[in-house]
Amino acid sequence: MGNDRAAAENLPAQTIVVFNTAVPDSEALAKFYAGKRAIADDHLVGLDCPLQEEISREEYDATIAEPLRKIFEQRQWWHVHEADDGEKRVQTLGIHFVALIRGMPLKIRPVATPYQGDTPGGGPIQSRNEASVDSELSVLGLFTRQISGVVPNPYFQGFRPVAEVTAAPLLLVTRLDAPGSATVRRMIVDAVEAEKNGLWGRAFVDGSHETSGGKEVGDAWMRAIVDQCHKEGVPVVFDDLPTIFPDAFPMSDCALYYGWYAGNIAGPFNQPGFKFVPGAIAAHIHSYSAATLRDENSGWAGPLASRGAAATVGNVYEPYLELTAHLDILNDRLLHGFTFAESVFMSSRALSWMGVAVGDPLYRPYFNWTQIDSKASPKSAAGWRAYHDFAIKNSDLGPSDYRTQARITAGRTRNAAMLEDVGLMEMRDGKFSTAIAALEQARGAYSKRDDIIRCVLEECDAFIKSGKPNRALDLARRVLRIVPESPASNLLHKIESDLTPKSAP
């Protein structure tokens, strides 16, 4: 742990902050971020770039890539030598993280005419030369003119700090960007505060029930995330239906969200007043989820940030599923204490491609969670912390014994989130009677209306799946009589409508 902590303290020295001098807010945000992360003033880099999100390859070369290469050499962040073939090679690398600030261009449009030094290949991948600015910058140190296709990522599936990777001069590029400057400032503050106080809350994972056409891998990622969270004592609500979470679904205390597959932000996120837990990580798989970051309702990346997420990932153009961020790897590395930037790049198979990561590159939401002072952290974190501690201490128990002990412990302490999670684990395994019992306990322990309604919805689902629709109907009606009307209660009305016997015509 000592070496890990020393490495963490050295992260600012490995980081540069790049802003657009043509955008006044960009420099102010760069200085704000550098101040929060103790990044030296001489690690701030201003470039005079176009104002548009989408730029040409020529504009990228002239205003971003070539000026940055010169600055890297001038400031001795790179030591470059000329190889036998006459090409430049980066010999040593002092900078590993790059934070692009709001105002920097987002993506490079396709080149229709021949580009000197490029050799396009055949097929849907090697023939394409558009890319995100961020992913292109990650291979800046390769000094290559090859822009078609992808560069295989040597860090993919890695499990060590990027400073230990010597296979290639890799830059881990993320951006602090959002529809508004105030949102970017909030993302910066939330990340720093979550590291101090802990990222506590539940995960919501939205599968798509895809079983063919190569898309089943996305659902495999989602199922793996559920298992990863359970091992760490992070409660999970998992929806494996083809549709996304319903509009009014009570998504309270959302610290992690992973889902797919809708074009624009939808579901509970569009409910008035929805907010993530400060510091939340959220990602939704879609081909154009980050086609723009300037519209709080277009795609997913910008809208998720606008609704309170501190970090997200997305794509600026069609990437193909296997070449998007593998969300199961992303989540696993975050849970193991890596930075957001390291986690994203370890989850990405391809570079010089379509992906972007939006958030503080140095953000480590789970690095300190075993060292956070329980007396200093908010009282509201006690239940989440207790579940995490239980999961770690009892990780050697088999599933049945683990859930039995978890339910006993949670029942004694009235840990509602833990009881609900045990119930959902039992339901996934088809153990409906014990699932219903645990969910009923959780419902009794919760005090907030939306949490109670969510448990009722889950109980009704368990009754229906166990062949007892009348029990589900009775429960929905009983709760509707005593719970005040809310958007979430509309889902109970739907259960009532669906299950009420229709009179014969």
Describe the role of every protein-language-model region.
Residues D389-F390, V422, E459, E496:
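Structural register within alpha-helical repeat arrays
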Residues F274-S347:
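C-terminal soluble interaction/assembly domains
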Residues D396-L397, D429, S466, L499, ...:
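Structural motif corresponding to the intra-repeat A-B loop/turn of tetratricopeptide repeats
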Residues E53-R223, D227-H230, S352-Y366, T370:
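Structured catalytic cores of large enzymes
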